[in-house]
Amino acid sequence: MNFFLKMVAFFFAALFPIINSRSAVLPKETTPEMLDRVYAECVKETVAYTEVAEFAPDGEYDGIKAVVFDGFDYCGEKTKIFAYLAFPEDAGEDTPAVVLVHGGGGHAYPEWVKQWLDAGYAVIAPDVTGYFPKETNSGAATDDEWTHSLDGVFAQDGYTVIPDNDGMRHSADALYEQWMYHAVGAVIRSFSILLQSGKVAPDKIGVVGISWGAVITSIYLGYDSRPAFAVPIYGSAYLADSLSYMKNMFAQKSTRSLWSAEDRFDRVTCPILWLCSDCDGNFSLNSNCMSYLATAKNSGTRLSVVTAMQHSHEAAWERPEPIVFADSIVNGGEPMPEFLTLPTCESLSCTVSGASRARLYYITEDMTYSLTDESNPLSTMPDQSWIKAPLDIDGGNITGEIPSDAVMYYISVTSDGCTVSSPIVKNEK
């Protein structure tokens, strides 16, 4: 089953909330303050994990461990979280590290772990939807490789799995029934495993999330001040303002109250790379730009809008920006290009550093989304295609004219294959 179909399977029910005695009113005990208390305690915990040698990847993934650790309790039982964990052979007090958070329909991927391991990072990749591998080297996320149950060596009395991705459908239910509550907790504890390993630099650990993993990452950042960097890919905050189907999930009163990542951005201080596409049917570009602007005060923060980038784990892995960005923060690498001044509705002239090429992308009407299939409420896609035009760049100064028919535009600059972008500008003329 391909990535998009898995997304549909996971989230279709989200547009039709379950009506029951608990979903009508947000329970008094489920408040933002309660989340603050729970996650603050979680950050302080010592987290133990157990290796499961039978499921350690081999072949090209040799050296990556399969581990389990406790998640939050669910329905009166303890839970287990599966993860892949790896350390460079020479790991030590200066080794950078990263938590990798998969997207909807995906799982922990040894392929993704290896990519960052080869770049010199210690890595943990938890499965944040409660799935466990059925065979060694599970990573392709096909239906027959993963199970949402504790079987074989994973089975243990008194333990169960955390809820599957519910598309925010249970945001009005008891906290322990909400998938996002468990997913954020799994990321916090994954971070702690790296931090407490004694094999990494405590101040060089970051978090990278793809799609729903980016949503989790955006929320997580408001509860944990330890990350040195973060890279949400596709997903972001401000999803109640989305033009895609995501709006239907995050505009619900209970979801907005508990899970609006932007409500806690005043707590976030680490540099963030918001990496996204200008043609994503799942996450609309306005939400990414709002997220960037809300966190641009954090030194090193960047927005990267990749034109025509498709939505998948594999497409995200192909981009150089995440590792280049991380290296620039924790490894002394060259910084990505930076907008020193931004374009406006009056003029697209702006200044940048470290860029070798500049391009203008614009549309001739306001950005909107529509269904491509009336029978599928998750089939949203943007109605407009961005028009590309070259811009002059000389000594970091970008010049050019705003096309007379441009209604919205942004500028992207590149260097060594990496893209950095301005947020969208609305042409008010």
Give names to the regions the model predicted:
Residues 295-313:
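Catalytic histidine neighborhood in serine/cysteine hydrolases
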Residues 317, 324-362, 387-395, 401:
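Surface beta-strand/loop "capping" patches
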Residues 353-429:
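C-terminal beta-sandwich/jelly-roll accessory domains of carbohydrate-active enzymes
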Residues 42-92:
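N-terminal cap/lid segment of alpha/beta-hydrolase-fold proteins
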Residues 82, 93-103:
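Short beta-strand element of the alpha/beta-hydrolase
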